């Protein structure tokens, strides 16, 4: 009888332990292990559609003085007309938490001249992670496999590294790429590439 009671007690403990266990589903987009942020080669930068002659000299940039102790937010929403007559829409939402850096800094965001990427200045490392929401609409994605499109850090040496985020969306017919809550640890150049292969099977990337 004592043996039966002991077995019953152990069984109940195991069942309670299983009920209290955390959800073990993997979300690579939102919580990529640090080891996965390795440099990748053989990538291809996704180009911006060529501007029409009337828009050729247009530059898309924004600057704002931010108190690092307070934090702040910068939103840039612009568009231009491509040479084929279609609109290219550009959106950036940069969120800077309080305590990200010390003192006042003039933060500047500049759209790259050729590729789907943004330059962020001044170059510095943060005490707290910045959050970036960024999208393009009206890109020519017909020749790309959507499963290999990703948002990355573009290093000065030509290499790229994956960026932790809460999800990447690719809508091929409308030429849309969108990243949610990309975690920026430092300022540099960030943008969109086609990788040579799918390095991690992000389960929450939605392709249409």
What are these regions (language model features)?
Residues 112-120:
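Short beta-strand elements of extracellular/lumenal beta-sandwich folds
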Residues 2-9:
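Sec-dependent signal peptide recognition
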Residues 96:
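B-type heme-binding environments
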Residues 19-89, 123-127, 140-208:
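Proteolytic cleavage junctions
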Residues 128-132:
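Structural beta-strand segments of beta-rich domains
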Residues 14-17:
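C-terminal motif of bacterial Sec signal peptides marking the signal peptidase cleavage site
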Residues 133-137:
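Short edge beta-strand/loop segments characteristic of extracellular beta-sandwich folds
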Residues 105-113:
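Low-complexity, Ser/Thr/Pro-rich intrinsically disordered linker/stalk segments at domain junctions
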